[in-house]
């Protein structure tokens, strides 16, 4: 940290952290798997960065979204998360300096690119600095514990599209409602 400060180097250097983790994984003879070792060192580096400066990372919120999960997977737990209600707000937060970085979905394996993110990247001076491949698992939840009582399905539009075949096969009669995030859908389901 002192050396970085003396030379005016940025606190977060993802390429350098990746080099260190890669070298540690190559030298690893066990008993930990490489992914476990990487996760441990990512948290050590995150905590070390926080001693220099606690970084704020904007993401598509609220808390509990895949974007939040991706943010902590990439930056570690020692950052301050800033949930934003829309992709536009994530970009605005970083552009205005309210956040040091932003995490937004760019693509997924079923629906392809997230067009709003690409539109914002074209309009913004911000650039992509890294990526996280995040396995996504969707769950259909009901407070009653049985699917017989489900009257509507709320989810983010992207998730509804990803699950459309399964939903059509199992619940063709139910109304589907797109909401701002899957976390918001869970909140709505818990209120029903």
Regions found by a protein language model. Give the residues of each.
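Domain-level signature for soluble enzymes in the chorismate/prephenate branch of the shikimate pathway
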Residues: 1-192
């Amino acid at each position: 940290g002192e050396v970085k400060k003396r030379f005016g180097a940025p606190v977060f250097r993802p390429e350098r952290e990746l080099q260190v983790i890669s070298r540690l994984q190559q030298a690893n003879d066990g008993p930990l798997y490489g992914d476990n070792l990487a996760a441990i060192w990512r948290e050590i580096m995150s905590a070390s960065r926080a001693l220099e400066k606690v970084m704020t990372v904007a993401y598509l919120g609220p808390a509990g979204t895949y974007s939040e999960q991706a943010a902590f997977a990439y930056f570690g737990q020692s950052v301050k998360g800033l949930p934003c209600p829309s992709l536009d707000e994530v970009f605005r937060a970083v552009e205005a300096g309210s956040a040091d970085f932003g995490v937004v979905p760019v693509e997924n394996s079923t629906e392809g690119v997230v067009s709003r993110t690409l539109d914002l990247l074209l309009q913004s001076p911000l650039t992509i600095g890294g990526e996280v491949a995040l396995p996504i698992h969707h769950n259909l939840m009901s407070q009653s514990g049985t699917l017989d009582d489900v009257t509507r399905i709320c989810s983010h539009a992207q998730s509804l599209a990803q699950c459309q075949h399964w939903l059509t096969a199992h619940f063709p009669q139910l109304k589907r409602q797109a909401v701002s995030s899957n976390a918001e859908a869970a909140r709505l389901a818990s209120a029903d």
